[in-house]
Amino acid sequence: MPYERKIINDPVFGFINIPKGLLYDIVRHPLLQRLTRIKQVGLSSVVYPGAQHTRFQHSLGAFHLMSEAITQLASKGNFIFDSEAEAVQAAILLHDIGHGPFSHVLEDTIVKGVSHEEISLMLMERMNKEMNGQLSLAIQIFKDEYPKRFLHQLVSGQLDMDRLDYLRRDSFYTGVTEGNIGSARIIKMLDVADDRLVIESKGIYSIENLLTARRLMYWQVYLHKTSVAYEKMLISKIGRAHV
């Protein structure tokens, strides 16, 4: 049987392959498609007009990087079952499914005391019932309950695919070039030791650049005074509406 897939053209990474089957079903699911209407960087477009990209685009980009990371780790002798690869790809596709309007801006405003990660998990469990348990392994990885801890670290950790994508993507769409990290090199430097994600010594300089890029993106984009002021006004309006 020929390999069937859906090809999506992404402005940041080029062509992204989505295999037909579980992963394609996730991409088409209404709960993930909902992210096409949620901006990745909240109200940052008031400062950077190009920042119109969405959580859906970010999820696809993180999925693409996850696919590359799995291939790279396997090439270094780290055995990963096909079922584990599919599960960790599913987990990264769904990691932001719990985001509400304006992404992080209204977190803990509309629903008090509940993080978007908790909502993501709730929605994943709901989807798992719809899909007859096909997401069970992905949920284990997402909750860090799977023995191969490095799989969870690829989804949520200091060198996760979420972070590698959002820095490059947010840099691309805002035009703040300081965030344009060398994600391809970082992925090539990844390895596993004692079921933990590690970096080769020759990749340390790339990690230093990543940390610097992240700090600069927070300074210039995520915590820009104008964006923060708009966010505070929105939160205030929502708060008054709840009274």
Role assignments for model-derived ranges:
Residues M1-K39, V46-A90, G98-R240:
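Sequence-structural signature of the catalytic-core scaffold of metal-dependent phosphohydrolases
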